[in-house]
Amino acid sequence: MKKFLILTVAMVVLAGVPGSLLAEKGFEVVKGKAFTDAIPTDFYLEGNRIPTQKRNSVLVHTPAGARVVFGLIDTTGYSSNIQQKYEGMIISETNFMLCGQKIGVGSFGFGHTKPMGTSNEDMKLMIYDQAGAKLAECSGKKDSSLQKPSPLQVMNGKLYLGRHAFDLK
């Protein structure tokens, strides 16, 4: 009976602890209705309304509990300048660090260099404001140990674009 009581108390206490604390104070991926409601169908960059790729988007809670959306966008049919410059979007409710670069509250586009598939070169990530001005640039290392790379994912405190990892803090 004593074990049952201790187990019950522990479950009640843990039920009241926010998920972000249980995620070792890291970036916690959010799914379900909260994810569905947070991902926009279109994203605005340089006067263009560009469709988002919900299947290649992630909603995370930061260690402080604020939300950040990372997602790829579909630039097919847009000018070559837009296609070459942008790959995705970031929408943030808080300041955070992306590979050592401070990203503020707001919405941003991002693009990257594309190293050869067999190359171990770093991938360069460029962050732009909605008017197209470059705000930051950083590099991500190739993680060959990644079992199942996808176009965009967040795990273990990193933003992954394919096999290239960019630190999140």
Show where each model-derived region lies.
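Mid-length scaffold segments of soluble, non-membrane domains
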Residues: 75-128
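Residue-level recognition of conserved structural "scaffold" positions that shape functional pockets
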Residues: 17-18, 107
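Residue-level signature of transmembrane alpha-helix interfaces in integral membrane proteins
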Residues: 18-19, 116
